[in-house]
Amino acid sequence: MSYSDKRDQYAPHMALVPMVVEQTTRGERSYDIYSRLLKERIIFLTGQVEDHMANLVAAQMLFLEAENPEKDIFLYINSPGGVITAGMSIYDTMQFIKPDVSTICMGQACSMGAFLLTAGAKGKRICLPNSRVMIHQPLGGFQGQATDIEIHAQEILKVKSRMNELMAKHTGRPIEEIAKDTERDRFLSADEAVEYGLVDKIFTHRD
């Protein structure tokens, strides 16, 4: 997780988005694949977590809540992490809305991606069998005058403490253990993520 927003690093581009054509009473209607999946209450969180992506994910969750506040939302995560403030806007929206948000890790959920994976509704946090999860402490890289660096160092320590508190809440592990385990990058397989309490189960096939 990065404390600062280095926007030039976070510019994922999709060269080709498949289109889906559906037959309706009024003729054919085409959707891009992600819009079609949104109709099934599926949201994709892929690539770096940054402000633009976070706004889109939050907006989709709010839209689905308005459509049906009782029906689950499915958030598929394949992310190396990103900016903390952007990730926290997604986290707060997940906790705020009425529908349960089921989180599914495909590929990887690292750093802020892992945090959002763990923030899903209890009993509905899932890893696919060959996915991996990585947790660590927030990263900082502020430059400037000594006094400003000190201010930002104090702030990132506050953020670190808050993130540890929330991870402890969602995993059920002691905050001291979370703090120790996130001092360095810690990679976990799907099985290890279940054992640690980051997710609840592994899905190999649909029921």
Swiss-Prot record:
Catalytic residues in the record: S111 (nucleophile), H136
GO cellular component: cytoplasm; endopeptidase Clp complex
GO terms assigned for molecular function: ATP-dependent peptidase activity; ATPase binding; serine-type endopeptidase activity
Catalytic activity: Hydrolysis of proteins to small peptides in the presence of ATP and magnesium. alpha-casein is the usual test substrate. In the absence of ATP, only oligopeptides shorter than five residues are hydrolyzed (such as succinyl-Leu-Tyr-|-NHMec, and Leu-Tyr-Leu-|-Tyr-Trp, in which cleavage of the -Tyr-|-Leu- and -Tyr-|-Trp bonds also occurs)
This protein's record includes keyword RNA-binding: no
Enzyme class of the recorded protein, top EC level: hydrolase
Compartmental location: Cytoplasm
Pfam name, any one: CLP_protease
Domain of life: Bacteria
EC number assigned by the record: 3.4.21.92
InterPro entries membership: ClpP, ClpP/crotonase-like_dom_sf, ClpP/TepA, ClpP_His_AS, ClpP_Ser_AS
Keywords recorded for this protein, A-Z: Cytoplasm, Hydrolase, Protease, Serine protease
One GO biological process term: protein quality control for misfolded or incompletely synthesized proteins
Family the entry assigns: Belongs to the peptidase S14 family.
Self-association state and partner proteins as the record states: Fourteen ClpP subunits assemble into 2 heptameric rings which stack back to back to give a disk-like structure with a central cavity, resembling the structure of eukaryotic proteasomes.
Function field: Cleaves peptides in various proteins in a process that requires ATP hydrolysis. Has a chymotrypsin-like activity. Plays a major role in the degradation of misfolded proteins.
NCBIfam families linked to this entry: clpP, PRK00277.1, PRK12553.1
Protein name: ATP-dependent Clp protease proteolytic subunit
Organism name: Photorhabdus laumondii subsp. laumondii (strain DSM 15139 / CIP 105565 / TT01) (Photorhabdus luminescens subsp. laumondii)
